């Protein structure tokens, strides 16, 4: 009987949705969206990040003033309790993803370990 990895991936997706880490992100993001100032800061910072990524992908240099603006945004975000809670929740979920990834690639690691 052949194993369908996609069935397992779909089960993993459902398990992630039921996890405490996912629920924490969902709640934290709802709190960010519910607070006008938090939402504005969050959206501005995301836009800055996207612009930086696009410039890096195109090989463009990021201007000093853009870096300064990003640093100021990052400082404002650190002071925002809603966004800080969201970032903490995201870090916890990222740790879960890293651990899951280690489990997933273990068979390949074993092949190349010899």
From Swiss-Prot:
InterPro entries: Com_YlbF, YheA/YmcA-like_dom_sf
Database matches in SUPFAM superfamilies: YheA/YmcA-like
Highest taxon of source: Bacteria
Family: Belongs to the UPF0342 family.
Database matches in NCBIfam families: PRK13676.1-5
Protein's name according to its UniProt entry: UPF0342 protein SAOUHSC_01977
Organism: Staphylococcus aureus (strain NCTC 8325 / PS 47)
């Amino acid at each position: 009987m052949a194993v369908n990895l996609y069935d397992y991936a779909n089960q993993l997706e459902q398990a992630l949705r039921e996890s405490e880490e996912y629920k924490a992100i969902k709640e934290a993001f709802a709190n960010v969206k519910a607070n006008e100032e938090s939402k504005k800061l969050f959206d501005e910072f995301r836009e800055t990040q996207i612009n930086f990524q696009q410039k890096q992908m195109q090989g463009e240099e990021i201007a000093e003033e853009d870096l300064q603006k990003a640093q100021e945004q990052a400082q404002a975000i650190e002071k925002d309790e809603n966004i800080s809670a969201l970032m903490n929740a995201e870090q916890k979920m990222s740790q879960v993803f890293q651990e899951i990834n280690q489990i997933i690639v273990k068979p390949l690691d074993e092949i190349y370990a010899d």
